[in-house]
């Protein structure tokens, strides 16, 4: 359900964006459910489960920087649908890789239909996004292709072993920029591109979008440790339990490699390597130690800087 824009947007802006976002939502739900009774349930599953719709909102917002007549036109609306379809497709694939039981408060697709069906459903949604983008012109098609490549490359860089000698923090930022920043950047660029805001504006909003993506993920790293389960709906330290080294842990490892890690940090890394994080008490202890260590504040500062 579409509510209001964040950050106390001016009423005049909301008056333009909200109806356009409602149109994007209607088109999105139509696109994910226009096949047949066999295909429609999995393809519509996550779209109907809701979501923030950050990417189409950004497309609609940056379109306001160009021709106001084009800013809520057919191409901009279809671009909003395409970026959200692409995002949703990656969620199907992510949940298979992560073996996630839930997504957006609903059972994940592979939990309901199995891994093969979930992967193919993601592929179908990418194909449908590509069909929409094909009508937006060659520049939009190329941008979508390059972005999807970056999404996949980011996932591969996260999945495969990091090359020896690679700075862990720099490597992680690259992963975040590819996995999350690239699609948000394209979402911002599409609005400016299709409303003919000009090349300079396209470049600015694209860079802005990528920085938002990296900052969002860094903030999520903080939230994973600093918030409570009542607020987020998940156990603090979930990433740690899944074996994911997020920024606070990477900062510890980098300091250790440089011979600059304090005793508290060394104790945390030791606990991570030897403790059973499936044990709630052990996980809670590691989370409590990380909350007190300066790396958490440093990660928060990095998110603000980005």
Segments (PLM) and residue ranges:
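All-alpha prenyltransferase/terpene-synthase fold signal
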Residues: 1-306
């Amino acid at each position: 359900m579409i509510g209001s824009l964040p950050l106390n947007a001016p009423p005049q802006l909301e008056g333009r964006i909200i109806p356009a976002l409602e149109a994007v939502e209607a088109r999105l739900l139509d696109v994910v459910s226009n096949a047949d009774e066999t295909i429609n349930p999995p393809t519509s599953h996550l779209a109907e489960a809701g979501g923030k719709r950050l990417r189409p909102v950004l497309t609609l917002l940056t379109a306001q920087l160009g021709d106001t007549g084009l800013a809520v036109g057919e191409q901009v609306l279809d671009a909003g649908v395409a970026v959200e379809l692409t995002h949703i497709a990656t969620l199907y694939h992510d949940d298979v890789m992560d073996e996630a039981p839930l997504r957006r408060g609903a059972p994940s697709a592979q939990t309901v239909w199995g891994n093969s069906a979930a992967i193919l459903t993601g592929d179908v949604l990418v194909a449908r996004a590509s069909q929409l983008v094909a009508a937006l012109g060659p520049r939009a098609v190329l941008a979508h292709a390059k972005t999807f490549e970056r999404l996949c490359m980011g996932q591969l860089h996260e999945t495969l072993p990091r090359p020896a000698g690679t700075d862990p923090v720099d490597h992680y930022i690259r992963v975040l920029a590819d996995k999350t920043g690239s699609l948000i950047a394209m979402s911002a660029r599409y609005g400016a591109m299709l409303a003919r805001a000009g090349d300079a504006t396209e470049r600015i909003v694209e860079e802005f979008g990528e920085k938002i993506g990296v900052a969002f993920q860094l903030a999520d790293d903080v939230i994973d440790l600093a918030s409570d389960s009542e607020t987020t709906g998940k156990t603090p330290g979930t990433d740690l339990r899944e074996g994911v080294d997020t920024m606070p842990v990477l900062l510890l490892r980098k300091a250790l490699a440089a011979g600059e890690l304090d005793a508290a940090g060394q104790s945390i890394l030791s606990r991570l390597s030897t403790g059973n994080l499936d044990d709630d008490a052990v996980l809670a202890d590691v989370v409590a130690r990380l909350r007190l260590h300066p790396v958490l504040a440093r990660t928060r500062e990095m998110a603000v800087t980005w």
